[in-house]
């Protein structure tokens, strides 16, 4: 059972009955692919919950469930308990009408790229229209492959120090979830 985060949508018109349209947080699916360390799953769950998101999908996690995930989740054990494990990214995103992927690496292939703030505004607008979206995060040590990125409509990049632009997966999730929360207020 997923709980709903109900927020007034600043991008949407009022409903016909003059009530405000709302965002349902269960329309935002955070997808972790091939996560190596279970503690990162717990940290991502915590990052999500602090920003009002609770829908977590795991594609081929190395170890899950795990005491390490629980230990690093803080009070976000409900997010872990409700997480769904999938065998493929396609299966995890099949309900989504729009998919975003994250990457810190330069690519030879060009994808439509947005920063976290732009993506969050776009995500929020889509969820106000009852569109389910997914945000895919890759394996800690290598990110997503080009084939995995091909499953996304847009790529999210978080600007960072060019000498060391790699963020931990939970940090990346926290930034994007924060931007979504910010876009909703």
Regions found by a protein language model. Name each.
Residues 1-7, 16:
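Histidine-centered nuclease catalytic patch
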Residues 10, 14-185:
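Post-transcriptional modification and biogenesis factors for structured RNAs
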């Amino acid at each position: 059972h997923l709980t709903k985060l109900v927020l007034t949508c600043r991008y949407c018109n009022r409903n016909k009955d003059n009530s405000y349209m709302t965002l349902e947080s269960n329309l935002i699916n955070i997808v972790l692919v091939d996560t190596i360390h279970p503690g990162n799953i717990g940290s991502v769950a915590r990052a999500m919950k602090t920003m009002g998101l609770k829908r977590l999908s795991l594609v081929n996690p190395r170890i899950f469930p795990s005491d390490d995930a629980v230990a690093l989740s803080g009070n976000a054990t409900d997010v872990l308990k409700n997480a769904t494990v999938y065998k493929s990214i396609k299966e995890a995103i099949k309900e989504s009408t729009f998919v975003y992927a994250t990457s810190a690496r330069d690519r030879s292939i060009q994808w439509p790229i947005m920063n976290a703030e732009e993506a969050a505004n776009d995500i929020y607008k889509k969820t106000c229209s009852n569109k389910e979206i997914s945000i895919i995060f890759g394996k800690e040590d290598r990110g997503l492959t080009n084939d995995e990125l091909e499953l996304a409509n847009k790529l999210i990049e978080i600007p960072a120090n060019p000498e060391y632009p790699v963020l931990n997966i939970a940090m990346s999730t926290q930034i994007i979830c924060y931007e979504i929360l910010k876009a909703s207020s």
